[in-house]
């Protein structure tokens, strides 16, 4: 066990360091998400600059790179404390990727994937919380912030032994969103569907 856990932490960080947003944009011939839109290499920004297909590919990959290392460690019998560190390592890789000059994203989808192995019931509640918040407010960042705030309480209800690791993960996500929190407070945050609300050209009579 003592040899497996540190190795899984390193593997999780390396998996997290594979920035799907940058790779998908390169393959699709889109601008670098770090230099376009909001400047964040994540699914929401790829949605703004590249559309739904590219954003969906980024979202799925980002979820999987958090899910697979934690699921593998869970199957090997790693304890909750180490599982939490593995989940955090995957998110740290996404936020500060060694393969992309340490310029990464916010870690929301990767954190969601890392939490998913705890149980499908928790996964459904977390996804529902994010979706409901986004539908009501229009802000993807607010959905992430609210989900991070309530995640430890959900986990305490479903699987209390994972509460502390998930709380650490939530703190990391909230810290990463400090700029978004300030923009939300000032009313300067962009809504997720703002790019689709372009005025149609008026027909000439």
Curated annotation (Swiss-Prot):
Highest taxon of source: Bacteria
GO MF annotation terms: acyl-phosphate glycerol-3-phosphate acyltransferase activity
InterPro entries listed in its UniProt record: G3P_acylTferase_PlsY
Keyword Secreted among record annotations: no
UniProt-annotated location(s): Cell inner membrane
UniProt xrefs under Pfam families: G3P_acyltransf
Enzyme's top EC category: transferase
Keyword Lipid metabolism listed: yes
GO terms, biological process: phospholipid biosynthetic process
Signal peptide range in chain numbering: none
Recorded topology in the membrane: Multi-pass membrane protein
GO cellular component terms given for this protein: plasma membrane
Positions of transmembrane segments: 4-24, 80-100, 112-132, 138-158
Reactions catalysed, as given in the entry: an acyl phosphate + sn-glycerol 3-phosphate = a 1-acyl-sn-glycero-3-phosphate + phosphate
UniProt keyword annotations, A-Z: Cell inner membrane, Cell membrane, Lipid biosynthesis, Lipid metabolism, Membrane, Phospholipid biosynthesis, Phospholipid metabolism, Transferase, Transmembrane, Transmembrane helix
Known partners and oligomeric status: Probably interacts with PlsX.
Function: Catalyzes the transfer of an acyl group from acyl-phosphate (acyl-PO(4)) to glycerol-3-phosphate (G3P) to form lysophosphatidic acid (LPA). This enzyme utilizes acyl-phosphate as fatty acyl donor, but not acyl-CoA or acyl-ACP.
Family: Belongs to the PlsY family.
Protein name (database record): Glycerol-3-phosphate acyltransferase
Organism: Cronobacter sakazakii (strain ATCC BAA-894) (Enterobacter sakazakii)
Source species taxonomy: Bacteria, Pseudomonadati, Pseudomonadota, Gammaproteobacteria, Enterobacterales
Gene: plsY
């Amino acid at each position: 066990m003592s040899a497996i856990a540190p190795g899984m932490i390193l593997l999780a960080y390396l998996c997290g360091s594979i920035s799907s947003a940058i790779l998908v944009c390169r393959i699709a011939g889109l601008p670098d998400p770090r230099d376009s839109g909001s400047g964040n290499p994540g699914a929401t920004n790829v949605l703004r600059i590249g559309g739904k297909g590219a954003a969906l590919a980024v979202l799925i990959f980002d979820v999987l790179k958090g899910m697979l290392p934690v699921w593998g460690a869970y199957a090997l019998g790693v304890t909750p404390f180490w599982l939490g560190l593995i989940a955090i390592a995957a998110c740290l890789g996404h936020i500060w990727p060694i393969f992309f000059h340490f310029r990464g994203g916010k870690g929301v989808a990767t954190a969601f994937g890392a939490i998913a192995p705890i149980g499908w019931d928790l996964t459904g509640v977390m996804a529902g919380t994010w979706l409901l918040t986004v539908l009501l407010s229009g802000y993807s960042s607010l959905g992430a912030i609210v989900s991070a705030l309530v995640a430890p309480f959900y986990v305490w209800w479903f699987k209390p032994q994972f509460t502390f690791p998930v709380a650490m993960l939530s703190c990391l996500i909230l810290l990463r969103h400090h700029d978004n929190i300030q923009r939300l407070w000032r009313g300067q945050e962009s809504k997720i569907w703002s790019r689709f609300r372009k005025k149609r050209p008026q027909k000439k009579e």
